[in-house]
């Protein structure tokens, strides 16, 4: 799996409100917003469209973990 650029634009499609979406200038901000949802650690609450890629909850969680790890190491 290729590495994602966290500074690319992204759109979050919320599952709990069909048709609702939120645009972000940075993929990292989109991931953080999704993970702020109380049930995001257990359930699929959204998916993200970034450039030509569809990102499901499992990958959103992985990106968040890597982002947290990178911030602690820097």
List each model region and its residues.
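A short, charged, amphipathic alpha-helix used as a generic interaction element across diverse proteins
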Residues: 25-40
């Amino acid at each position: 799996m290729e590495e994602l650029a966290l500074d690319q634009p992204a759109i979050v499609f919320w599952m709990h409100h069909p048709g609702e979406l939120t645009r972000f200038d940075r993929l990292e901000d989109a991931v953080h917003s999704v993970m702020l949802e109380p049930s995001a650690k257990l359930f699929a609450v959204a998916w993200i469209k970034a450039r030509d890629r569809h990102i499901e909850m499992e990958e959103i969680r992985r990106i968040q973990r890597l982002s947290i790890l990178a911030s602690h190491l820097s």
